[in-house]
């Protein structure tokens, strides 16, 4: 679809989107429910498509794609009506000198949302963003990834079987479609992908002054504290390194542990590695990015513990999960995005050191903390420069349908998922109704403007002076000014 064809499509969508936005939220949510049920009915087709596209096994297709998308739909069914309802401003929050005013804040659809999709979780991540945009009343133009063609086809089919025509359009998955979409007359962009692509899109959006949500890469850390369960933390790190063959934005890349636990942690990781069968990764270019970073780290002093030789890392499209120890936070492998199963082990002496190591990375998507103390875990979590933290688990908690998902730094901005993700698809519209005819501020545009100075000054002192004496003085000045004005 070229620029002209897309422009014509958007003109038609504008009309349909306006009608869709006016539809009762309950009617929109009935369609979400139908879509959720279709996910269940077509689960085997979806799983087969995911396997065809990326080699994702059936259990992972169910647990990491279909189930979390269904849960995200159910969250909207239960909560969207409340979240999108107009919010009345309480009388107690209204300044008393605005006593004649009553205000409401409405949530309006942004209009047409352009979604540039990803390939690593093509059903879950794309599905959540599309459904949230539609529930908020938007039209959606979706540019799917060229690396998940079969899954894209089924997702589009289920959307079109559920929602009205002309509020959802799927573009070609070719790379050329992305710039065409961003240059078109859309109102908001949601993009999941690399830092480089995110920067290019941010620049394009800035030129048109349209907002965006960017969910970019991560180099997530797992912090094992002194009182944490070593076996559980090591198992979590291994799981979070290898899920989806390491092709997960919130995969654990840095395992930050007390230096006294290095031997115990390494032993556990090697035990897990020896019984693990590596999976084929989808994009060989990801191996091309990871291997030089591994080489550079080893030259700078890191030690490869698994696999036993460097030549065993990448064979026949299979990337064996790497375990590197003696890694330091300034190494490239801790600062450049990797989309392959590589786990770097870093050691620390104090908790402050651990926090410093985690925050040294320019990416800030997610993090995990393992500790026996919930209080300590939350205290450390609040110091981490990331968008989400899980305590005593990894990856899975971030898929909770009621929580926002998004990063800071080079991991992007904005949020998808949960309340924040839904509201991100809207803009606030405040409406204030003023009764009566008392409008003293109109005098500011008349020759009597200076007469209001004592009244406004008295009001300011009466309400905001730092001392009781000052506030009493303000009330006196206000009453005196009002009396003098009445006499005149």
Question: Where would I find each of the regions flagged by the language model?
Answer:
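Short, flexible turn/loop "capping" segments at secondary-structure junctions
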Residues: 10-11, 213-216, 244-249, 315-317, ...
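Structural signal for hydrophobic packing residues in well-ordered secondary-structure cores
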Residues: 17, 21, 36-39, 43, ...
């Amino acid at each position: 679809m070229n620029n002209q064809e897309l422009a014509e499509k958007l003109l038609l969508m504008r009309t349909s989107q306006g009608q869709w936005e006016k539809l009762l939220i309950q009617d929109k949510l009935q369609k979400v429910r139908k879509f959720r049920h279709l996910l269940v009915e077509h689960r085997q087709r979806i799983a087969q498509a995911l396997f065809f596209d990326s080699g994702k096994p059936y259990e992972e297709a169910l647990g990491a794609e279909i189930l979390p998308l269904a849960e995200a739909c159910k969250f909207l069914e239960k909560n969207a009506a409340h979240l999108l309802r107009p919010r009345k401003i309480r009388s107690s929050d209204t300044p008393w000198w605005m006593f004649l005013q009553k205000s409401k804040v409405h949530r309006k659809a942004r209009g047409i949302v352009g979604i540039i999709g990803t390939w690593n979780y093509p059903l879950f991540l794309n599905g959540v963003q599309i459904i949230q945009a539609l529930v908020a009343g938007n039209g959606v133009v979706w540019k799917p990834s060229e690396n998940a063609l079969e899954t894209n086809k089924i997702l589009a089919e289920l959307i079109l079987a559920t929602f009205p025509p002309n509020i959802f359009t799927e573009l070609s998955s070719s790379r050329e479609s992305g710039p065409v979409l961003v240059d078109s007359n859309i109102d908001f962009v949601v993009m999941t992908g690399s830092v480089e692509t995110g920067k290019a899109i941010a620049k394009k959006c800035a030129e048109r002054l349209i907002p965006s949500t960017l969910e970019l890469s991560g180099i997530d850390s797992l912090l094992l504290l002194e009182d944490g369960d070593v076996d559980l933390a090591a198992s979590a790190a291994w799981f979070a390194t290898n899920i989806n063959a390491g092709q997960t934005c919130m995969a654990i890349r840095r395992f930050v542990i007390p230096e006294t636990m290095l031997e115990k942690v390494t032993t556990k990781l090697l035990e897990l590695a020896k019984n693990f069968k590596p999976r084929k990764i989808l994009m060989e270019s990801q191996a091309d990015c990871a291997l030089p970073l591994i080489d550079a780290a080893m030259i700078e002093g890191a030690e490869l513990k698994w696999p036993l030789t460097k030549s065993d890392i990448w064979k026949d499209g299979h990337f064996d999960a790497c375990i590197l120890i003696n890694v330091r936070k300034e190494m490239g492998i801790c600062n450049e995005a990797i989309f392959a199963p590589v786990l770097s082990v870093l050691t620390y002496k104090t908790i402050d050191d651990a926090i410093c190591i985690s925050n040294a990375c320019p990416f800030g998507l997610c993090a995990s903390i393992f500790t026996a103390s919930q209080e300590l875990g939350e205290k450390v979590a609040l110091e981490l420069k990331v968008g989400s933290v899980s305590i005593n688990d990894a990856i899975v908690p971030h898929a909770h349908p009621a929580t926002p998902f998004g990063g800071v730094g080079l991991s992007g901005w904005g949020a998808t998922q949960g309340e924040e993700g839904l509201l991100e698809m809207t803009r606030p519209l405040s409406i204030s109704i003023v009764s009566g005819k008392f409008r003293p501020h109109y005098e500011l545009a008349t020759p009597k403007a200076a007469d209001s100075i004592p009244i406004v000054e008295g009001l300011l002192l009466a309400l905001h002076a730092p001392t009781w004496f000052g506030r009493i003085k303000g009330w006196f000045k206000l009453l005196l000014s009002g009396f003098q004005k009445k006499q005149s």
